Amino acid sequence: MEKGDGKMIIGMQEGAKRDGVRDQRIAKVVELVPPQRLLEELPLAAERAQAVVRGRQEVVDVLQGRDSRLMVVVGPCSVHDPVAALDYARRLSAKSEELHEDVLVVMRVYFEKPRTTTGWKGLINDPHLDESGDVNAGLRIARKLLLEVLDTGLPVGCEFLDPITPQYIADCVAWGAIGARTSESQTHRQLASGLSMPIGFKNRTDGNIQVAVDAVRAAAASHAFAGIDDAGMPAILHTTGNPDCHLILRGGHGVPNYHPPEVEDALVTLGVAGLPERLVIDASHDNSGKDPEKQFLAAGDIADQVADGNKAIVGVMLESFLVEGRQNLVPGEELTYGQSITDACIDWEDTASALERFAAAVEARRGS
């Protein structure tokens, strides 16, 4: 993998330490590449930009019920190997084309990994898998991969964790998510209000749905907050609000919430809040205990609800890679190609089977 080019800023750091007040726990400061420079080095270009716009509109149409297809956001828990991720994308693109009349496939391409305590923080933060924190290289690798995935014909979905990251990659993204640990965060609600694509808010890790519903309402409003502009300069960003935010059910504290009674409760909560009674269900996380076999079963249960005529379920999320399960990242040990180093995933064969089942469910729903 390529190395970043950020230079260390030493003078400011030493001056800060000498006054005995500032930056006493900062080891070093490294210059971050400005967004505009990275966008010029790795341009979206007209054809790719048109694909992103088209993908966003298709997602919106599904979320708003104008398109009867089911959106399926599917891909690795968190990308650690761009080569394997692109291999996966090419297989997924072929399957997407086969099922495109019934399923809108969005590839999950996650680069930032929220941690409950510590651990690998994702490709952008640690692209070399060695805790070196080479964020400049991580941003380049991430953007390059997004462009390559777009070239396969797939729209892209990302989780947004760091509020600065979107300036580097958001122009490539058709759908975004705010995770369970950050749905309650004002910073992320403000961020979502200014993003140019639909954003899903997950229910909290304890299963609380109201927090995510409140987040959807908050992100629909306009906000002003501190961020950076394309030149990398500090700026105050004024947003118009995002009308395309929605709820994602992901279970909580080991208890799933994808079964019909929990889905109905969530729809009632949305209705009381004055929001459209439509939602996305994450078949992984606490809806499966991060167990690939249970995730596959959860996907089947969700497909059955769709087949039975439930039009409120407009999307599903799956954690999927080439090889089932997960592996530990151990220094000096070779990694299994195509297997997750974060949450356990279903393998490619089960992924293809799940997509086919979702497509059949949509056909049944249309006829119900």
Regions found by a protein language model. Name each.
Residues K7-Q13, A49-V52:
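Long, contiguous binding/interaction regions
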Residues G11-V30:
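Polybasic, low-complexity association/targeting segments
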Residues R18-R22, D102-Y258, E262-V263, H285-D286, ...:
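Active-site-facing alpha/beta catalytic cores
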Residues R25-Q64:
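N- or domain-start disorder-to-order transition segments that initiate the globular core
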Residues M71-A84, D343:
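Conserved phosphate/anionic-ligand binding catalytic regions in large, soluble enzymes, centered on
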Residues G75, I281, D347:
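Conserved, mostly hydrophobic/aromatic
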Residues F321-R366:
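Internal helix-turn-beta structural module
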